[in-house]
């Protein structure tokens, strides 16, 4: 498998620290508000990555944190704690806000068929681990206390900002506009490991520490939680491209300083979902959620398909017109699968293996989900049995998770119910899109037969046959297909 590594800025052959096993970490949500669909694009693509690794035979352990303290509005060390901001907005406690939006996040994930990670760890569960890691960094000379806070000393590193290759003088003090420089820092790119009351005295969540009552910085959370559950060596760290700097840059700095060796082999970043005004984000005010899509009549799975049609390393522009096109594509795909007939015949293993190889080749190519979607249509066109096609589609859908077989089964039931309505002549398109002109001719043929005008009925049948259309008479109606 070739996978693009943000750390080295190139595609590399995937390898693991322990043969056959993958230690995978995902930056989880900051649970102060609903996730917007741009956030969820990252989790969809990470879900495909995890499922494809499992499909390929790896034993995957995936860990995700829940940030319920310490993530400031600047994404660096300035601004207001996002959790406190959410609590004030809704006049609730921070922990009430955290529980509500954690539950909401996983409800959205379930609707999008995003698998829950093996381990989900809220930051507030791991305060002892954070304190121990900060103490270790101080002991090793990589951290210092100033103004009551503990800072990581970036000047002690030979390399920093490995993701974006910025020169030192080009780096900004703050990530977002409107943040002030912290004068306690020895170097402008140092970052906070532990805050005390010298900052943000109204912070709702505080714990005792060797440096006074306070709370952890955002970056220390992911490092300590991943080391706790995955050990000192990690294979893949996932996240949105927003997190590459400063969050992931600072994670690498503190983790490798603490451990004394390379920490993570591959960094997997999903690019932005943009709307007509640019990058989608909560800081803009209103934003698109799964709930909003549902209220507009969209199945969340169609949004998943919309995401899979584009490569994860490309910015994806969201429009409702684009989502409408995904609806049409999805419905056509389901109609084609619904037309396949299940049977007890043996699987055509030669055909199945050829199709499997094409699907795996697509995803081995830097998780190219667009090519993997094309592989679905290759299955439908392949000269083999319907039973084999259904088997292979089910295997592929373990990775893509588009409800292909269950949606097709539902479609078949709907067609059966339509056919048995008393007194109705039902026309069903089999394996193709409905066509009003074809349906009108088939109904005219039925009327001619009822009037015993068999010559006219035969004429219409021959006309349709000349168009490449075969009619199959069934109880209560007719089916037609293109041949």
What is the meaning of each model-derived region?
Residues 1-32, 47, 106-107, 127-341:
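Alpha-helical recognition segments enriched in aromatics with Gly/Pro capping
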Residues 59-61, 141-147, 383, 470-472:
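Short, well-structured beta-strand/strand-turn elements
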């Amino acid at each position: 498998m070739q996978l693009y590594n943000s750390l080295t800025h190139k595609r590399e052959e995937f390898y693991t620290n322990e043969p056959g096993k993958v230690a995978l970490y995902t930056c989880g949500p900051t649970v102060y508000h609903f996730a917007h669909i741009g956030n969820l694009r990252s989790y969809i693509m990470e879900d495909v990555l995890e499922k494809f690794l499992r499909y390929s035979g790896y034993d995957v352990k995936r860990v995700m944190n829940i940030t319920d303290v310490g993530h400031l509005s600047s994404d660096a060390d300035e601004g207001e704690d996002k959790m406190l901001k959410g609590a004030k907005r809704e006049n609730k406690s921070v922990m009430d806000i955290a529980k509500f939006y954690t539950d909401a996040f996983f409800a959205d994930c379930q609707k999008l068929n995003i698998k829950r990670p093996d381990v989900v760890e809220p930051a507030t569960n791991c305060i002892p681990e954070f304190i121990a890691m900060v103490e270790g960094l101080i002991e090793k000379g990589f951290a210092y206390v100033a103004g009551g806070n503990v800072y990581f000393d970036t000047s002690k590193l030979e390399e920093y900002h490995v993701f974006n290759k910025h020169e030192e003088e080009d780096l900004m003090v703050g990530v977002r506009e409107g943040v002030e420089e912290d004068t306690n820092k020895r170097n402008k790119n140092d970052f906070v490991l532990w805050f005390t009351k010298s900052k943000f005295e109204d912070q709702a969540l505080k714990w005792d520490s060797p440096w006074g009552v306070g709370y952890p910085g955002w970056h220390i959370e992911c490092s300590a939680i991943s080391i706790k559950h995955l050990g000192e060596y990690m294979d893949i760290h996932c996240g949105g491209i927003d997190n590459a700097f400063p969050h992931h840059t600072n994670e690498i700095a503190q983790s490798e300083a603490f451990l004394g060796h390379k920490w993570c082999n591959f960094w997997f970043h999903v690019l932005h979902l943009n709307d007509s005004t640019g990058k989608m984000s909560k800081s803009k005010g209103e934003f698109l959620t799964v709930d909003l899509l549902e209220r507009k009549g969209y199945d969340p799975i169609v949004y998943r398909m919309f995401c899979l049609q584009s490569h994860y390393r490309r910015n994806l522009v969201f429009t409702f017109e684009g989502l409408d096109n995904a609806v049409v594509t999805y419905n056509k795909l389901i109609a084609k699968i619904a037309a396949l007939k299940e049977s007890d015949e043996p699987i055509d293993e030669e055909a199945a293996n050829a199709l499997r190889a094409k699907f795996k080749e697509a995803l081995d190519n830097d998780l190219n989900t667009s090519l993997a979607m094309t592989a679905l249509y290759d299955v439908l066109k392949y000269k083999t049995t319907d039973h084999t096609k259904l088997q292979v589609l089910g295997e592929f859908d373990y990775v893509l998770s588009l409800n292909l077989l269950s949606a097709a089964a539902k479609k078949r039931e709907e067609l059966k119910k339509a056919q048995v309505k008393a007194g109705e002549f039902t026309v069903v398109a089999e394996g193709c899109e409905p066509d009003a002109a074809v349906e009108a001719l088939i109904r005219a043929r039925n009327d001619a037969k009822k009037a015993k005008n068999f010559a006219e009925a035969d004429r219409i049948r021959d006309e349709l046959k000349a168009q490449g259309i075969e009619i199959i008479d069934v109880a209560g109606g007719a089916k037609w297909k293109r041949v």
